[in-house]
């Protein structure tokens, strides 16, 4: 501003350009005063006034300065007071006049400098003014916001007060309702108890009634059996009486004849003829005797034959009433008869008796006279294979062999139905539907000759029919002749009328395939059932063919050349020239075309040029092939408009081509299997072109002379030679089209002849020529699936987006027929996916309508490349879409290409692709559509229906879960475990399941789902084994066996929002989770803070009931000690119980304190007393008890002597009163008395399995909680913990027991149990391990090696050192009494080292490696990581040099066989009698160590005798026995337990002492046996006689460096005693044999 003001002053001394610059600068800084507000104008005025004042002051100062300077220059140039002036004076005096400069500058320059300074100050002031203005504006805005916030705060405070009042009212109402509901609950609980009691009573009554009913049923069945037996006996007697009656009648008639003869003889005698009657009488008598004999023996046989035939006709009506039962395959338990057994076995009356109506006597005769060989209908095989109604089929039997089945009473109810001829699953006209269009006379002849059910079919089997009455030899001969004649005619007719069978491997060779399991493609005719003779007139009307009828095959026939009769135009046939015709499979729809397979190899003999064969289609049922269509070569039925139908469609097509046509089910490029090229070449060479079939003529004979027609024929047949010849002719129209508009290129593309298409395209045929329906060659090739033709046509610039008359594009047709390769080529060519038909359908609709998943995936995800330069250019990898990956996670691999508008496009009816997929039940297609994020499943059609409304059940479920949220449910264990129980062993949170929350899910459903998930999880982790939640094996009770249920839940967090079961919010669960971004549901269990132990139970897997019992013991008895093997969670349990007690006492209003003390070896009783006093647990006698609760936890008490530490405190702790004080002796000789008050609780932990020595004196003063490894809670803790760990890895799911993770976990559990079992047998309880060390077992799905590596680390760091220490401590109890335990451990002898290594090796093989889930090769790689897995044999052999006591005898160290000592493992040795040598003892010990086959007491020692083992060990140690030898024997007996057969599979056979084989599973082998070869049980030799041989064989093998042979045979439990007795005999042999064995072992070393 000052500058502006200054510039307004006239200054004539300035240059003109300076004035112009100042004017421009003033113009720039000028602003509009009118726009300023009043306050701004005031401020501007004040600023301008200040500047004016400043300008006046400056002017005055300048004037004064100018005056002063003028005076100074004129009058005061020289002033002595100023040295500057003196210097100036000298300067002026010393220089010339011209060189002198003025003393001061021009006043105008000074004025300009002052004005420049004023300008700068003006600029600074302006910037400061603008900043001040902006700050003022911000301050005003903040004031306004503050006022608004204050108003909102007041409003919210008022609302809060209102809500508080409402909430208070609601809370009061809820309290009242809760009280009412609690009363109701109690009433309902009482009612429920009453109802349950009544239910139990009713169950008991029902059980008694069921028992009575079962007893009555048993009685009734017994009575029925007795009645059946009596009836059978009565039937037998009746038959016998009938036979006897017949014999008697015959005898009576004979006697009557004899009487008549006697009368005649008497008359003759009377007449005087004495000689002749006397001679005839003996003959008659002789005849009479022979007749009587024949009647008695042959009568019943003749009658039995009559019984098979005569009553059959009478009982037909009766039999027809039976249920339809056609047994085809006899039961597996029926006995078999050899093939040479005759069929006329004498029947038994009780054999094959039916359980049906027994009133008619002829029915019984039918059954009683049945032969034991079943009728052929039982194993009947029709001419074309097994019958369609039979559940299974038997292979055909040869004619010379009788059916090898005998009917037993087990199938008696079916035998009568087998004998009944009228029951069959076939219809009388079942075969008529299979050959429509044939001559009725041929069908009638076939029907007639197949009508005889007794005729054997081509497989040599006969069907059952009523036997003929005439059994004379002449009738039988004629019957055989008739059968042969009918069989011959039937075979000829069957070959003529049925489609030819597949090519046999050898003409005339029998079929070796199993007809019942995999039927080959065969003839489709069915043989008519064998019923009574049918009238041989015309056959019954032909029923329509059923699509679901499974057509049974027939064995292949030799090639038969059938020549058609030219005069018979109505019969269909085909001329076959050494080609095998294959019928389509029976599962294809009607009208399948019959295709030609590969030509059989031609014979070397010269033949005429082959004529092209004609493919005929089997016409649909009910419509025969017309005479014109079958007799004329060029017949072509009218085709329905459009190419929407696949190659195998319902329309009947006759396509003469020698190329196997590709059906829509399995499209194959026809160009890759051109089998008729040689035929076509021969045809072209021979000039026999008129026989080529014209393809494109619709009815009538084809004009065979036209060249365009020949061109189309050659293109249709794929005759490249003829086509090239025709294309070389001049004047030929290659674009000629027939009446349907089909060009030669169209025909070649439709039939997939790629070479023909290439020739025509090179000849410049029109690539986009359309037929009368608008289809181009590309449309035809895409519809038929000829992707090679499609690729070729696209390369020649065919219109890929051409739409037919109905709007179908090539892409649409390819999607409709599911031609994947064609779709890929079209998409890569850049075809439009959004072209719509007249009906509004897109290719997406077509693909979904066909249910083709691959086509839909290609449409949605296949990206077209940027450009394709040439035909043979490879596809870029970016455009390739992996169908398999796309199915799993298409979003992860690529995003959908098609937009949301196309996926949601609706047709004329309003249906989208989702509607079509849902209505048809195509769940896979619908799932792919749902993965598109732009899908609108709520889109409605014109009938206002969504896809969900028209969907099937599966698709409805999919749509309902479309937008479902998968929220994991986790359980938090509450407090983290103290000390070394860190997060490595105890997971903070465990996933139990994932909830699917849908939009329609209510809070009630959500609460039920959470509760059910918790219940299922608790039951799953506490169940035995790996039982899935879906098995239904869990109880319906809410509590699990560990005591947890939904009542154990403290709170639930939905993300970060607290929620309680049954609580509802205004929003639905789905909206609530979405809005709050809740990613998980966390369940918190009640813990010690609430005075509960549920969280402790879940964290430690100790049952809640047991923890509550422990807590009750502490609260009731005040003094409790927890003891068990190391790692039994004693410290954790004690600490959690202390926390729970503390919070309970605090909730009751008491103050409580927990004092933890870790005891070590230097902890004295004085320090313990100070701890009691400082924690106010011990108070002076004069002081009254206080209300403070004190909980003292003493940990690691096993490190000190309990009797020394607690000896003085035992009485005061037990009697807590002033009468039983504890006296504290002070240093000055004074003492003070203290006592324990009732509010003090003492808990201790001991990591020791059992107490010994003086520590037992403390036992009676405390309550002891023993945590045994083989009892609860420790026994089930580890399985439950690891099962929960596995479920957490599998996100709450229980894997199948076959899963490798389950096997690995089971192996870890087995290691812990077997290890402790073996250590208990060894008598080393100090080495027992609790489950704590195994809680860190890694659970890595698919990587069992991680668990084995972890086991190796655990073995090397924990298990092996403990075992080594325990074994050394036991072996050195008597060895070095003077040195003590530490000296023995620090300097173990050589024998002790050997024993330790033996123990480690045995434990490793028996307890750790046994049952390892790894393969043998993988396990061998990890065995070296285990310490003690193998040790050198020299160390063990030096064990022989160890000195023994002189009184020890080898003879008395042998096993005693007295009955009194058989029950123990080892009888105490007697030292009274001296032995002949000590070498036998040494030999026996080392031989038993090296060759466990000599372990005499191996198999009868089991794991149940731990107590006797301990007693025996104590006795032997007390008698001064050699502890090392005892340990070796104990190790050996442990090694030869029942699981040895399994150990031998795991142990490495190449290590000398890793495999300990027992005599129960090692047979005698020679030295040449392959060690890997399994041995059959037949090769096992008696153990008693071959035991020395086994030892010598194993010795020789080890000397030769060959690994020892291990047996893989299991040891039956029943043979354990036998084996042990046999080995006893061998081990009790002379010592010389043992010495020899020892010598062998030395040589080996």
UniProtKB/Swiss-Prot annotation:
Q: Which CDD domains match?
A: bZIP
Q: Report keywords, A-Z.
A: ANK repeat, Cell projection, Coiled coil, Cytoplasm, Methylation, Phosphoprotein, Repeat, Synapse
One Pfam family this sequence matches: Ank_2
Which stretches are tagged as biased composition: Polar residues?
407-417, 451-477, 580-590, 1558-1569, 1582-1597, 1635-1645
Please give the Gene Ontology molecular function terms for this protein.
Answer: protein phosphatase 2A binding
Q: Name one GO cellular component term.
A: postsynaptic actin cytoskeleton
According to the lineage, what is the superkingdom?
Eukaryota
Q: Which residues carry this modification: Phosphoserine?
A: 1521
Q: Carries keyword Heme?
A: no
The parts of the chain that form a coiled coil are: 119-276
Asymmetric dimethylarginine modifications at: 495
For bias type Low complexity, the affected ranges are 1620-1634
- Which function does this protein serve? Regulates the dendritic spine distribution of CTTN/cortactin in hippocampal neurons, and thus controls dendritic spinogenesis and dendritic spine maintenance. Associates with the striatin-interacting phosphatase and kinase (STRIPAK) core complex to regulate dendritic spine distribution of the STRIPAK complex in hippocampal neurons.
Subunit structure comment from the entry: Interacts with CTTN/cortactin SH3 domain. Interacts with STRN, STRN4/zinedin and MOB4/phocein; this interactions mediate the association with the STRIPAK core complex and may regulate dendritic spine distribution of the STRIPAK complex in hippocampal neurons. Activation of glutamate receptors weakens the interaction with STRN and STRN4.
Protein's name in the database: Cortactin-binding protein 2
Query: Source species, please?
Result: Mustela putorius furo
The taxonomy runs: Eukaryota, Metazoa, Chordata, Craniata, Vertebrata
| Gene for this chain | CTTNBP2
């Amino acid at each position: 501003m000052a500058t502006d003001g200054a510039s307004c002053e006239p200054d004539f001394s300035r240059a003109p350009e300076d004035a112009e610059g100042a004017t421009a600068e003033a113009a720039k800084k000028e602003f509009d005063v009118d726009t300023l507000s009043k306050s701004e104008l005031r401020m501007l005025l004040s600023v301008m006034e200040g500047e004016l004042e400043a300008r006046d002051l400056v002017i005055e100062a300048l004037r004064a300065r100018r005056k002063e300077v003028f005076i100074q220059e004129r009058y005061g140039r020289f002033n002595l007071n100023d040295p500057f002036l003196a210097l100036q004076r000298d300067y002026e005096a010393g220089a010339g006049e011209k060189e002198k400069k003025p003393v001061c500058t021009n006043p105008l320059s000074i004025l300009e400098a002052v004005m420049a300074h004023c300008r700068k100050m003006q600029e600074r002031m302006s910037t400061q003014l603008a900043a001040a203005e902006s700050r003022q504006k911000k301050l005003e805005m903040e004031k306004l916001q503050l006022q608004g916030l204050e108003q909102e705060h007041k409003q919210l405070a008022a609302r809060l007060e209102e809500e508080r009042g409402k909430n208070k009212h609601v809370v009061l109402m809820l309290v009242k309702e809760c009280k009412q509901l609690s009363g109701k609950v109690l009433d309902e609980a009482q009612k429920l108890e009453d109802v349950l009691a009544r239910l139990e009573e009713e169950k008991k009554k029902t059980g008694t009634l069921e028992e009575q009913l079962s007893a009555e049923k048993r009685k009734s069945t017994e009575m029925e059996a007795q009645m059946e037996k009596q009836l059978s006996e009565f039937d037998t007697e009746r038959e016998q009486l009938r036979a006897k009656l017949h014999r008697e009648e015959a005898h009576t008639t004979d006697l009557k004849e004899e009487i008549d003869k006697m009368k005649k003889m008497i008359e003759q005698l009377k007449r005087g003829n004495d000689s002749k009657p006397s001679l005839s009488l003996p003959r008659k008598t002789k005849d009479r005797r022979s007749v009587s004999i024949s009647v008695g023996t042959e009568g019943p046989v003749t009658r039995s034959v009559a019984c098979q035939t005569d009553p059959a006709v009478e009982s037909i009506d009766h039999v027809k009433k039976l249920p339809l039962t056609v047994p085809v395959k006899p039961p597996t338990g029926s006995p078999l008869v050899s093939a040479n057994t005759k069929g006329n076995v004498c029947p038994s009356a009780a054999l094959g008796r039916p359980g049906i109506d027994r009133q008619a006597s002829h029915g019984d005769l039918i059954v009683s006279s049945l032969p034991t060989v079943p009728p052929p209908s039982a194993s009947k095989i029709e001419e074309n294979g097994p019958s369609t109604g039979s559940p299974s089929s038997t292979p055909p039997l040869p004619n010379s062999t009788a059916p090898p089945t005998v009917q037993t009473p087990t199938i008696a109810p079916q035998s009568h139905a087998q004998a009944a001829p009228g029951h069959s699953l076939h219809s009388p006209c079942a075969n008529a539907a299979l050959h429509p269009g044939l001559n009725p006379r041929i069908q009638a002849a076939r029907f007639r000759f197949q009508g005889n059910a007794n005729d054997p079919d081509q497989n040599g089997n006969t069907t059952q029919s009523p036997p003929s009455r005439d059994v004379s030899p002449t009738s039988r001969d004629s019957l055989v002749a008739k059968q042969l004649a009918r069989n011959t005619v039937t075979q000829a007719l069957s070959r003529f009328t049925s489609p030819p069978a597949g090519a046999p491997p050898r003409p005339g060779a029998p079929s070796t395939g199993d007809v019942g399991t995999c039927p080959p493609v065969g003839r489709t005719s069915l043989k008519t059932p064998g019923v009574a003779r049918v009238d041989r007139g015309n056959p019954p009307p032909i029923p329509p063919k059923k699509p679901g009828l499974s057509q049974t095959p027939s064995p292949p026939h030799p090639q038969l050349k059938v020549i058609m009769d030219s005069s018979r135009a109505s019969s269909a046939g085909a001329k076959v020239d050494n080609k095998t015709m294959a019928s389509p499979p029976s599962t294809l729809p009607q009208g399948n075309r019959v295709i030609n397979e590969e030509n059989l190899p031609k014979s070397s003999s010269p033949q005429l040029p082959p004529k092209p064969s004609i493919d005929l289609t089997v016409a649909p049922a009910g419509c025969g092939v017309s005479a014109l269509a079958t007799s004329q070569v060029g017949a072509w039925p009218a085709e329905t408009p459009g190419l929407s139908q696949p190659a195998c469609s319902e329309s009947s097509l006759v396509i003469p081509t020698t190329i196997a046509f590709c059906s829509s089910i399995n499209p194959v490029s026809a160009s890759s299997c051109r089998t008729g090229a040689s035929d076509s070449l021969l045809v072209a060479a021979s000039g026999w072109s008129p026989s080529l079939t014209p393809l494109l003529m619709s009815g009538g004979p084809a004009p065979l002379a036209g060249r365009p027609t020949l061109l189309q024929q050659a293109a249709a047949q794929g005759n490249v030679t003829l086509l090239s010849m025709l294309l070389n002719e001049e004047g030929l129209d290659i674009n000629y089209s027939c009446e349907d508009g089909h060009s030669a290129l169209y025909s070649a593309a439709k039939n997939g002849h790629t070479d023909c298409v290439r020739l025509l395209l090179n000849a410049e045929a029109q690539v986009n020529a359309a037929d009368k329906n608008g289809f181009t060659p590309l449309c035809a090739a895409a519809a038929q699936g000829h992707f090679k033709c499609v690729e070729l046509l696209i390369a020649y610039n065919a219109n890929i987006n051409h739409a037919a008359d109905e709007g179908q594009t090539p892409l649409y047709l390819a999607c409709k027929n599911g031609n994947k390769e064609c779709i890929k080529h079209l998409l890569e060519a850049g075809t439009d996916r959004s072209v719509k038909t007249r009906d509004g359908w897109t290719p997406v609709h077509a693909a979904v309508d066909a249910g083709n998943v691959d086509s839909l995936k290609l449409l949605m995800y296949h990206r077209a490349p940027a450009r394709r330069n040439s035909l043979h250019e490879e596809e870029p990898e970016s455009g390739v879409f992996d169908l398999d990956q796309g199915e799993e996670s298409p979003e992860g691999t690529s995003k959908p290409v098609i937009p949301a508008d196309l996926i949601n496009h609706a047709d004329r009816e309003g249906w989208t692709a989702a509607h079509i997929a849902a209505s048809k039940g195509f769940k896979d297609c619908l799932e792919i559509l749902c993965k598109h994020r732009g899908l609108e499943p709520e889109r409605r059609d014109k009938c206002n229906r969504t896809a969900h409304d028209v969907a099937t059940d599966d698709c409805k479920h999919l749509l309902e879960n479309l937008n479902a949220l998968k929220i994991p449910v986790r359980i938090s264990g509450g407090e983290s475990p103290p000390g070394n129980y860190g997060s490595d062993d105890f997971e903070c949170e465990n996933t139990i399941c994932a909830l699917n929350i849908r939009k329609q899910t209510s809070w009630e459903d959500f609460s039920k789902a959470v509760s059910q998930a918790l219940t299922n999880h608790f039951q799953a982790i506490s169940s035995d084994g790996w039982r899935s939640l879906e098995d239904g094996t869990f109880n319906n009770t809410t509590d699990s066996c560990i005591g947890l249920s939904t009542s154990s839940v403290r709170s639930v967090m939905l993300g970060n929002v607290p929620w309680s079961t049954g609580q509802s919010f205004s929003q639905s669960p789905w909206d609530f989770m979405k809005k709050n971004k809740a990613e998980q549901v966390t369940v918190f269990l009640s813990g010690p803070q609430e005075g509960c132990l549920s969280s402790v139970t879940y964290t430690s897997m100790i049952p809640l009931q047991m923890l509550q019992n422990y807590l009750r013991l502490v609260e009731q008895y005040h003094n409790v000690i927890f003891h068990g093997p190391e790692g039994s969670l004693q410290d954790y349990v004690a600490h959690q119980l202390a926390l729970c007690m503390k919070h309970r006492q605090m909730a009751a209003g008491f103050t409580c304190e927990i004092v933890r003390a870790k005891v070590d070896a230097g902890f004295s009783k004085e320090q313990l007393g100070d701890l009691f006093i400082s924690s106010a647990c011990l108070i002076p006698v004069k002081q009254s008890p206080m209300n403070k609760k004190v909980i003292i936890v003493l940990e690691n008490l096993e490190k000190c002597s309990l009797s020394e530490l607690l000896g003085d405190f035992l009485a005061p702790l037990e009697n807590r009163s002033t009468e039983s004080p504890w006296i504290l002796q002070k240093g000055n000789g004074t003492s003070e008395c203290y006592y324990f008050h009732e509010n003090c609780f003492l808990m201790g932990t001991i990591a020791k399995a059992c107490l010994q020595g003086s520590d037992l004196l403390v036992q009676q003063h405390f309550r002891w909680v023993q945590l045994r490894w083989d009892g609860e809670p420790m026994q089930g803790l580890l399985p439950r913990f690891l099962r929960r760990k596995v479920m957490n890895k599998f996100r709450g799911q229980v894997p199948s027991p076959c899963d490798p993770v389950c096997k690995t976990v089971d192996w870890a559990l087995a290691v812990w149990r077997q290890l402790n079992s073996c250590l208990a047998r060894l008598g080393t309880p100090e080495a027992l391990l609790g489950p704590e060390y195994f809680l860190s077992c890694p659970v890595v799905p698919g990587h069992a090696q991680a668990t084995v590596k972890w086991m190796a680390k655990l073995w090397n760091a924990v298990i092996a050192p403990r075992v080594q220490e325990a074994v050394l401590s036991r072996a050195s109890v008597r060895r070095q009494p003077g040195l003590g335990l530490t000296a023995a451990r620090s300097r173990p002898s050589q024998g002790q080292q050997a024993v330790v290594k033996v123990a480690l090796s045995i434990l490793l093989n028996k307890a750790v490696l046994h049952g390892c889930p790894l393969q043998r090769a993988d396990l061998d790689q990890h065995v070296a990581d285990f310490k003690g897995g193998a040790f050198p044999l020299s160390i063990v052999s030096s064990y022989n040099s160890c000195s023994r006591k002189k009184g020890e005898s080898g003879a008395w160290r042998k096993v005693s066989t007295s009955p009194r000592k058989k029950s123990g493992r080892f009888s105490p040795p007697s030292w009274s009698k001296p032995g002949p040598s000590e070498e036998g003892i040494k030999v026996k010990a080392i031989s038993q160590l090296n060759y466990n086959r000599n372990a005499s007491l191996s198999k009868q020692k089991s794991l149940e005798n731990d107590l006797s083992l301990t007693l025996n060990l104590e006795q032997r140690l007390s008698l001064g026995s050699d502890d090392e030898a005892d340990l070796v024997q104990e190790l050996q007996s442990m090694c030869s337990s029942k699981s040895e057969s399994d150990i031998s599979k795991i142990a490495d056979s190449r290590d000398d002492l890793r495999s300990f084989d027992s005599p129960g599973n090692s047979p005698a082998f020679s030295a040449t046996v392959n060690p890997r070869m399994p041995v059959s049980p037949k090769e096992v030799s008696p153990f008693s006689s071959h035991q020395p041989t086994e030892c010598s064989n194993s010795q020789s093998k080890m000397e030769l460096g060959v690994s020892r042979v291990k047996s893989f045979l299991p040891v039956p439990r029943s043979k354990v005693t036998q084996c042990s007795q046999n080995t006893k005999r061998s081990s009790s042999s002379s010592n010389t044999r043992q010495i020899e064995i020892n010598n062998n072992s030395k040589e080996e070393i």
